[in-house]
Amino acid sequence: MDYKTQFAESLSNIFTNELTQKQILDLIETPKQDEFGDAAFPCFSLAKQYKKSPAIIAKEVAEKLSDPFFTKVEAVGPYVNVFFNRDTVSDAVLKTILAEKEEYGQNHFGCEKTVVIDYSSPNIAKPFSMGHLRSTMIGNSLKHIAEKCGYEVVGINYIGDWGTQFGKLITAYKKWGNEAVVKEDPIRELFKLYVQFHEEIKDDEELEEEGRAWFKKLEEGDEEAVELWNWFRHESLKEFSRIYELLGVEFTNFQGEAFYNNLMEDFIGILEEHDLLEESEGALVVNLEEEGMPPCLIRKSDGATIYATRDLTAALYRQNTFGFDKALYVVGPEQSLHFNQFFTVLKKLGYTWVDGMEHVPFGFILKDGKKMSTRKGRVILLEEVLEEAIELAKQNIEEKNPNLKQKEEVAKQVGAGAVIFHDLKNERMHNIEFSLENMLKFEGETGPYVQYTHARACSILRKESVEFETCTFTLKDDYSWNIVKLLNKFPEVIEAACNKNEPSVISKYVLDVAQSFNKYYGNVRILDENAEKDSRLALVYAVTVVLKEGLRLLGVEAPEEM
């Protein structure tokens, strides 16, 4: 039951011609102070129609509004404020959560629709750095949120597995590589070779030509070049899979850039058919001057295609294969122009489905105010950060609860969860200041704080067993009421997170629920034997359901003991 909908329904019986129930619902606000009620309806938009001041309209509406659902209705200036019957609402909300369990919050507006989400997309033979964390975790969370809203979700890891860098890497491996050494630590060793190539090229310009020659061989299907490329790709994907497992991230497919090699000429043919290609200094481009953008480069003067061609080809392939209604590209803000050009070219081709495509950018991870990329002159590996976080979580557990069962498993859940939650707790366009020490604290706005609150609630339920099926729940105190109101908001929070492509909406929400529950825990004697005990335990159970599901939508696990 949504009490705002109930309020909107009651108001729509008064405003039969002036406003629809949906318009009323959109206008309803939640007062910042409890003394102004549980919901408020502003009357400003009706002043012109009624030819009366909003305050007079509010007074007249308050007099007409009667519903057993409300214990009090009052006009305060231009607002109609209502106080809900706490017994009725708490009983309805708790019964809904107890019945639906982890299904609670499910929306259906995405039913029979498909969304493709392109996220993570690391480059083969390069380390999985902290820079990849944001795209990976934002995309993973958006995938869970879209599924919760009824969408069929296709999660694509558009691996960077093609390009001239592979000619350079093959050259470096042929000159300085050792198969046994590479097999021991593939990504680190291949990256070392790639870096060595760029060091050596300063004194040996012929290396550039050798790199080009090997890439040409690769494009032409040379057996040795293809065999090495396949090996580099296979070893890299094995490494990436280990990190994805640690983060709990899954994809529908790993169709990378190379997958589209044989499809690009067909797409270039479509551009030619629509007379969109122009020659510019020997290259082929789509002119976007009318749209106020530089031309979109399709084929370089040496005949090579670039990533715009690949992305355009991939978009058409994905539409033909999955018939998507929405396509999200979770990629850094530096690619904004590329996506504007890419979407505009598709529009010029007359594809209406481009309206469902969206670039979902995000801020940077900073260390001491600077973009985080190197530590002692090298790339900061995400795996190292996760291992460090898990180790610190283990130390925290040893200090706080040395007898905890499954310490290793819980340390993984807390360590990885801390890194993920820290990434998702702020609006995605905000830059993030990285601090392992802060993100692992058990108090404040952290993942471990929410996880610990969930574990605390679970520990209360282990002490008592209640059959909730036959109960009627009555909760009147302010601490309980604040939680009930928050729990009731969960479905609309999920919908807002989905519509805004914004996981932080859920992060902030679970923090609010955790803080509200901890106030309740500190002020209410939950296990006291009296008439409200079953209702209080039902509330605790409902909190565990919503916290666990909220964390799951973020890609964070919720241990039952910590």
UniProtKB/Swiss-Prot annotation:
Name of the top EC class for this enzyme: ligase
Gene Ontology molecular functions: arginine-tRNA ligase activity; ATP binding
Pfam families: Arg_tRNA_synt_N (PF03485), DALR_1 (PF05746), tRNA-synt_1d (PF00750)
Presence of keyword Nucleotide-binding: yes
Keyword terms, alphabetized: Aminoacyl-tRNA synthetase, ATP-binding, Cytoplasm, Ligase, Nucleotide-binding, Protein biosynthesis
Disulfide bonds: none
Keyword Coiled coil on entry: no
GO CC terms: cytoplasm
EC numbers on record: 6.1.1.19
Catalysed reaction, written as an equation: tRNA(Arg) + L-arginine + ATP = L-arginyl-tRNA(Arg) + AMP + diphosphate
GO biological process: arginyl-tRNA aminoacylation
Top-level taxon of origin: Bacteria
Motif 'HIGH' region, residue range(s) on this chain: 122-132
Subcellular compartments: Cytoplasm
Family indicated by similarity: Belongs to the class-I aminoacyl-tRNA synthetase family.
HAMAP family on file: Arg_tRNA_synth
Alphabetical list of PANTHER family matching this protein: ARGININE--TRNA LIGASE, CYTOPLASMIC, ARGINYL-TRNA SYNTHETASE
Quaternary structure and partners: Monomer.
Protein name: Arginine--tRNA ligase 1
Gene: argS1
